[in-house]
Swiss-Prot record:
Cysteine-cysteine disulfides: none
PANTHER family the record matches: ADENINE PHOSPHORIBOSYLTRANSFERASE (PTHR32315:SF3)
Single biological process term from Gene Ontology: purine ribonucleoside salvage
Name the UniProt record assigns to this protein: Adenine phosphoribosyltransferase
The organism of origin for this protein: Thermosipho africanus (strain TCF52B)
Recorded catalytic activity of this chain's protein: AMP + diphosphate = 5-phospho-alpha-D-ribose 1-diphosphate + adenine
Classification via HAMAP family: Aden_phosphoribosyltr
Molecular functions per Gene Ontology: adenine binding; adenine phosphoribosyltransferase activity; AMP binding
């Protein structure tokens, strides 16, 4: 199944000059969604790890499903003000602005092995910030996984030493 056919391009969203990769057609199609989860789980099952860390919102969809399928813990990473307990934070630059990520201070035990999952790898800024957040908490990032990688933005340039696993490369 060619999952690329389920990715819709939305020009000038959220800002002019940005092409948004809309995964809702993939999510809507039960066979495509299942295929994506199964393929990602197959790739990740070969790695020794304890937790999947994923940012809101679309990272939750895949990160939660993968955690369930692989019998691993799931750590949600949110925007400021969304978590009820004490947090650690990391600020970073996006393709179209600045942002901040937070997770509970006790989310990761020292030495736990983590896979970071997000729906799209664009510039690598979010992934880099997620890694810093995991390391602040005492975790070790053993891989970064993505549904879609936008190779034309050269995200691997800033993630040179990372084990990157992408399902769809555009």
């Amino acid at each position: 199944m060619d999952l690329r056919t389920f990715i819709r391009d939305i020009p000038d969203f959220p800002e002019k000059g940005i092409i948004f990769r809309d995964i809702t057609p993939l999510l809507k199609d039960k066979e495509a969604f299942k295929h994506a989860i199964d393929m990602l789980a197959e790739k990740l099952s070969e790695i020794d790890f304890d937790l999947i860390v994923a940012p809101e919102a679309r990272g939750f969809i895949f990160g939660g499903a993968l955690s369930y399928k692989l019998n691993k813990g799931f750590i949600p990473v949110r925007k400021p003000g969304k978590l009820p307990y004490e947090v650690i934070s990391e600020k970073y630059t996006l393709e179209y602005g600045e942002a901040e990520l937070q997770m509970h201070v006790d989310s990761i035990n020292k030495g736990q092995k983590v896979i970071i999952f997000d729906d799209v790898l664009a510039t690598g800024g979010t992934a880099k910030a997620l890694k810093k957040l995991v390391e602040k908490a005492g975790g070790e990032v053993v891989a970064m996984s993505f549904l879609i990688e936008l190779s034309y933005l050269n995200p691997r340039d800033i993630l040179k030493d990372e084990n990157i696993i992408s399902l769809i490369i555009l």
